[in-house]
Design a protein with these regions (language model features):
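N-terminal strand-loop element at the rim of the active site
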Residues: 7-11, 23-70
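Aromatic "clamp/platform" in nucleotide-sugar-dependent glycosyltransferases that forms part
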Residues: 260, 279
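A short, well-ordered alpha-helix in the C-terminal region of glycosyltransferases
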Residues: 325, 332, 339-347
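A short helix/loop element that forms part of the nucleotide-sugar donor recognition site in Leloir-type
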Residues: 179-193
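Short hydrophobic beta-strand element within catalytic cores of glycosyltransferases
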Residues: 296-299, 309
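Carbohydrate-associated surface elements
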Residues: 153, 173
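Conserved donor-binding/catalytic core segment of Leloir-type glycosyltransferases
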Residues: 193-218
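Nucleotide-activated donor-binding/catalytic signature segment of Leloir-type glycosyltransferases, i.e.
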Residues: 243-259
Length: 347
């Protein structure tokens, strides 16, 4: 099949899953065409079965803002005709499903172009922030030829808000060949020269990820007398706040802010416990990646995370913002290597 895939090319779960899905489809003999404003984060290699089509933005004095939705629809339509696409798979209803539906309708009747939309959760939060987006978001979902959600939580939330339930749950995934615990002795030595256990946080450092809470948790762990270090992987608007809080608490020298990294699996393999204290997660891909690397997870009991992390078996769940309990759970895992290894193996 010739498959068009559109994702946000940013450092986030949807772009990662979309990229990995495309690569796995290509490995099975399909030809995948990524249609986006930039090369997706995890799409590091292009070949005859994995191709990239950049959406070109038009600068026109009449438009105050560049019309990305229309530009994307135009590129989708063009690629569909030139490459004889069999379907479009878009991640997020807004704006991607709207663009895909426009492209599909523009090609009728000479070409049939089914549209599959995968919901990742931002569509729900967008409507929650501004109800005026509800009709157009619902239109993008209802008019899709197929709709999937990444968790049962998200399916139920979509049903409640949009009164639409023809949704198939297909959880996010990681490739076991790529995500497994590796021997990264040199990296671990760099991150922890004195051999202390390592807490790690991986995200895009948006407020919803609560990276400052990771610093608060770590400070409480140190106060309990546990010798450890904190590794913060990623970048975003909250990074400066997290660094500032670490300095205020006098623990900055025990933290490593390493920014965006191309090989997350190396950092997960080097560390011992993942912190994911998010306000909201429709799934929690970082948790799944950590678990694949035998790293137990300390996370919020929110959204789809309980479908990923089994409390007391593969990690510990707590109410959002309960940094005291998260610190207790983290300290317990850091000092009990046997428990940590058992949980990691179950994960």
């Amino acid at each position: 099949m010739n498959i068009g895939i559109t994702v946000y090319p940013t450092y986030g779960g949807s772009g990662i899953v979309g990229s990995e899905l495309g690569k796995e489809l290509a490995a099975r003999g399909h030809t995948v065409h990524f249609i986006s404003s930039a090369l997706p984060t995890r799409l590091t290699e292009l070949n005859e079965h994995v191709r990239f089509h950049e959406v070109e933005m038009m600068s026109y004095p009449l438009f105050e803002h560049q019309p990305y939705t229309l530009a994307l629809a135009t590129k989708m339509s063009t690629v569909a005709e030139e490459e004889k696409l069999d379907l479009l798979h878009v991640h997020y209803a807004i704006p991607h499903s709207i663009s895909a539906i426009l492209a599909r309708e523009s090609l009728k009747p000479r070409r049939r172009l089914p549209v599959v939309t995968t919901l990742h959760g931002t569509d729900i939060t967008l409507v929650g922030a501004d109800r005026s987006y509800l009709p157009i978001t619902r239109y993008g979902i209802v008019q899709s030829d197929g709709v999937t959600a990444i968790s049962h939580y998200l399916k139920e939330a979509t049903k409640e808000i949009f009164h639409f339930d023809d949704i198939r749950v297909i959880p996010n995934f990681v490739c076991q060949h790529d995500y497994k615990r590796l021997e990264v002795t040199a990296l671990r030595q760099t991150l922890s020269p004195q051999g202390q256990p390592l807490l790690v946080h991986v995200s895009n450092f948006r407020p919803v990820k609560r990276p400052v809470d990771c610093v608060e948790i770590f400070a409480r762990v140190l106060k309990k007398g546990v010798k450890a270090r904190l590794v913060m992987v990623g970048d975003g608007s909250e990074r400066t706040n997290a660094e500032h809080r670490a300095r205020c608490l006098g623990i900055y020298e025990h933290c490593s802010f390493v920014g965006k990294q191309p090989r997350i699996v190396d950092y997960l393999s080097a560390c011992d416990v993942l912190l994911l204290p998010s306000d909201q997660e429709s799934f929690g891909l970082a948790a799944l990646e950590a678990m694949a690397c035998e790293v137990p997870v300390i996370a919020s009991r929110v959204g789809g995370l309980p479908e990923v992390v089994t409390d007391g078996e593969t990690g510990f769940l707590s109410p959002v913002g309960d940094v005291d309990k998260m610190a207790v759970d983290a300290a317990r895992l850091l000092v009990d290597e046997k428990l940590r290894r058992e949980m990691g193996q179950r994960a």
